[in-house]
Amino acid sequence: MLYAVRVRGIYATALVALALKKGYLLSDLSKTMLSRVEVPVSTRPPNITVKHGEESRDEIVIHAFPYEAGERFEADLLEEVGHAAVRRSLLGLRSVVDARAAEGCRAEGPGGVLIIVKGGECPQPGSMVRVTVVRSPPGSDVVEGRVGVELTGLTVRVMHPGSGVRISRHLTSEDAAKALKAVEASGIDLNQFSVHIRSGARLASEGDISDEIRRLAREAERLWREGPGGEPAVLSRGEYLSLVYLPSTAKHVMDGLRTSLYPTVNNHHSLKSWSSEAEGLLTDFAEEGVREGLWGGEAGDLIVRFISSRLVGRTAVVLHRRPDGETIRLGPFRVSSYRPSSGRGGEIVLERTFRSPGVYDGLGLERRPGDRGVTHVYMGDWLTIHEYYDKSGRLLGVYANINTPPEVGFQGLKYLDLLVDVVKRPGEEPETIDQGELEKACRSGLLTDRLCEEAARQAERASGLLQSRYP
């Protein structure tokens, strides 16, 4: 089946290139995109919406119906970029499932997933209930459901039992009026069914919307009347939802895809992914020059070197992103030096003096006030080296963090932490730590296979590096 894709956000042009490469239809392109590239556009409502995340521009949101459309697009994206961290919903949004009720308005769903039952009275513990999943954030074990059957289509969602009509805020008044006529023409009883008009209704005829309402209402009524079965089960998979974190290496692949359709500087997506506007404005300016033939894509490398040099003498933070979605702000650090090299390379040195006591993670050593930390960040490399010294300048230990090649912005630096690390105390052998965390993330699919393999290689490399550099 050919699925139609709608793209939005900072990765939109690259995603158009990917969709064309992988054989998808394109639907509902923005005016900006239509002015930028000449591509065939389908008039169908989209099956898949792909955009950058609301909380992090380093992430891509994949929201799709049917469920398998999202699975396929995610697989195609990961095959292309290679390196990513992926968080998925435990159960598809608006999946219809049978669950066994437990105490406290909870129910055990398929696979032992715990569902919090919202709205109305709590079901009798031990009884079987048929619920629709209304909330299942990617990467979270919190799943919320509502008793009843809600089915998704491309233009509408229909709930039974339910009542009333809701309309997507993305529809114009004209499109909303068309959809309301379709609801009326469907002939369903709005005291028994609720209808939510989706944004995709804008691209459908009144007759198509009406037909989908009737079809979903019949199926929802059938599923509700037959009642729950004897064991937890999925009856309808609902909508696919996942968050794909793109580290710098994946963003470079996206740069290449974008270049195939539109003039693009190196590091385009890394620079655009920062929350401040400054990096994006520099990128836009550089790409004006590319379009006018004044310089090439390497102007993006110059931007990275410029930002890195501007950090010297200032304070900066390191955004230490973990695969599970947690971001730890390390610092603030004082940026003591920057040593540039060709392309995206170079070394940024960060320093800080500790004012409070504590323990150096991984090394198991006491940290005293007055101790000093020196961090070597190697642009384009997979290792970040932390050196720890006492007040007299004696080396206490070294910590090699395994992470994706860092990205630089005016705020500081960011990377995806790969969980495994290597530590070394003076006069001792290097020790690899947290290997189990990496293996768990790889088994669960949180990290892609290629990224897992790279993390293992880099941990081995770090061990040899620490042995030779810090005997």
Swiss-Prot record:
Keyword check for rRNA processing: yes
GO MF entry, a single one: mRNA 3'-UTR AU-rich region binding
Documented EC number(s): 3.1.26.-
Claim: rRNA-binding is one of the keywords in the record: no
A GO BP entry: rRNA processing
Alphabetical UniProt keywords: Endonuclease, Hydrolase, Nuclease, RNA-binding, rRNA processing
Function recorded in the entry: Probable RNase involved in rRNA stability through maturation and/or degradation of precursor rRNAs. Binds to RNA in loop regions with AU-rich sequences.
Family: Belongs to the FAU-1 family.
Protein's UniProt name: Probable ribonuclease FAU-1
Top-level taxonomy: Archaea, Thermoproteota, Thermoprotei, Desulfurococcales, Desulfurococcaceae
